[in-house]
Amino acid sequence: MTIWVDADACPKMIKDILFRAAIRTNTNLILVANSYLTYPNSPFIRSVLVEKGYDRADHYITSHMKAKDLVITADIPLAAEVIVKQGLAMSPRGELFTANNIKQRLTLRDINEQLRSAGERTGGPSALSAKEKTNFANALDRWLVKSK
């Protein structure tokens, strides 16, 4: 199993948790981004640099991931594609996206996008809290235990 990270928007503290987990459990971790990243020297961690452009990292991830791989992303359409490909998608806040909740999340995203297009200020996500960081670490550990 492999952990894929939509790395351009992934918070540093979440990447740090992922680095430690990959090294501790000998799990492959692939960071996909359109900018250069720094990461620990480990045979289990690598990065893929994609061209700058709309959804380039997303397309790379969905074309290379396998069923049961874990994808870390806050991008709802990417999470939906991962689910279709029988992967597991998790947000940097530790929320699991599933076949049961992804349609609702896509609808909410589309509504917010329409509001922004109409000039409404919808605001972005709040900063990651300590509780959300813990939720992410716990959800990741559960996946690692199940996948081994």
Curated annotation (Swiss-Prot):
One Pfam match: DUF188
Family matches, as InterPro entries: UPF0178
HAMAP family assigned to the protein according to its UniProt record, in alphabetical order: UPF0178 (MF_00489)
Family named by the database record: Belongs to the UPF0178 family.
UniProt protein name: UPF0178 protein LPC_0108
Native species: Legionella pneumophila (strain Corby)
